[in-house]
Amino acid sequence: EQGQFYTILGPSGSGKTTLLSIIAGLDKQESGKIYYEGDDLDKIGLYKYRRNKIGIVFQQYNLISYLTGLENIELAMTETDNAIPKNQKEVAYALLEKFGIVKSKADRLVTKLSGGEQQRVAIARAIASNVDLIFADEPTGNLDTATEQEIIKIFRMLTEEFGKTVIVVTHSNVVSELSDHRVVLNEGQLKDIQ
């Protein structure tokens, strides 16, 4: 459902990251089909799906280290077929500021930012190309409790203000309690949806 915040929970080895990788089009399922808006992903084409429909936030941020936060966002804006405004720099600054990265920090190399700041840049990069879905794999796993709370607020903002659907793999009860829906896995099997 569009504009909702989902968490995927389960013990280590239960298949959470594998499920996320499959629905994000990064891995191929062994059987069955994955549908996006009623269309089979195999027929849509994974390249088009990944380029225009989804953004991914990894636990390790995966930012381009020799670029600034701003440049990481601008690059993401060019890597899509979706409509991006002509004033990319201003939009990128505004997006970063919305997520708590002031202009002076946006102009720093991402390696000079704290872990929480890098994660904010990674989230901004994920939505910069005007996608519908945001997938995140343990996005708060390396962060302290206060920063984890700030990242959760950003995910809520993505759903409430931007209308994005957010799907997060997590071990954190704090993250799962603040999501709209919880999907529980165990040993590769769906055990519960709340």
Walk through the language-model features, giving the residues of each.
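Catalytic Walker B motif of ABC-type/P-loop ATPase nucleotide-binding domains
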Residues: 134-137
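ABC ATPase NBD coupling module
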Residues: 41-55
